[in-house]
Amino acid sequence: MRPEGSLTYRVPERLRQGFCGVGRAAQALVCASAKEGTAFRMEAVQEGAAGVESEQAALGEEAVLLLDDIMAEVEVVAEVEVVAEEEGLVERREEAQRAQQAVPGPGPMTPESALEELLAVQVELEPVNAQARKAFSRQREKMERRRKPQLDRRGAVIQSVPGFWANVIANHPQMSALITDEDEDMLSYMVSLEVEEEKHPVHLCKIMLFFRSNPYFQNKVITKEYLVNITEYRASHSTPIEWYPDYEVEAYRRRHHNSSLNFFNWFSDHNFAGSNKIAEILCKDLWRNPLQYYKRMKPPEEGTETSGDSQLLS
């Protein structure tokens, strides 16, 4: 019994015969080629298994190429902002020069009166300087907001490149001298790096290192904060590292066995002498353009077997 309101369509006899004919032909074709189809499937499975590594390498290379495009966008945004800022500064400077030319300069003055005049001018400059600092800070914050979409997109793409940050840090000309083989293994579990800067009430640089599960420590995120001034980065706060019991003794030994500046000492001891140098490299160089230090893997040549020791490209 059909539901109320349903429609019925009767297929003409000649079409039904045609369908049956096609069905019988298809069935015969399938039966006739069963063995051939099985062999084809086996060959396809073998080819698919052999090509997994090549496909993964291609995906990683595609992600790296996409990073190239994103970094170009970030640089364009930054360049546009800098040019606009420079043009604004030039315009304000020219206005100040014109205003200065319109005001007659002081006549001959005694040293005492000159110092008094100098003090008066300096007092007038203070609010102007404060206004300039605020304007520069607002401009910088505006630039950071405009860069954020590209930076977020860059971070998402980096997730598709296994070991990206370990590769970048280990190949930085200054950082490479501070990293041991054990440091590299620890860094291989690092999945992301983020840097945030705050200007108010103080200039603060926050470094966040994200890790997946590893045999060294339990932390998923380790945060290090630095107060920034004209001359240095000064340690402010760091997340305590929760070492696993099996590695805690080794961590203590490493920290006290080598008193020189290295990545492990910076990582495990926030107040280690010279650690501000590593913080500055991460904030001012690696974070802004990590791709320039990434060593790309040469894709395997056609017809050759892939191996874990593929040659690196500079």
Curated annotation (Swiss-Prot):
Q: Which UniProt keywords apply?
A: Cytoplasm, Developmental protein, Differentiation, Gonadal differentiation, Nucleus, Spermatogenesis
- Indicate yes or no for the key word Translocase: no
Query: What SUPFAM superfamilies does this protein map onto?
Result: NAP-like
Q: Name one GO biological process term.
A: cell differentiation
Give yes or no: UniProt keyword Cytoplasm: yes
**Entry's family note:** Belongs to the nucleosome assembly protein (NAP) family.
Q: What does this protein do?
A: May be involved in sperm differentiation and proliferation.
- PANTHER family reported for this sequence: TESTIS-SPECIFIC Y-ENCODED PROTEIN (PTHR11875)
Q: What is this protein called?
A: Testis-specific Y-encoded protein 9
Q: Which organism is it from?
A: Homo sapiens
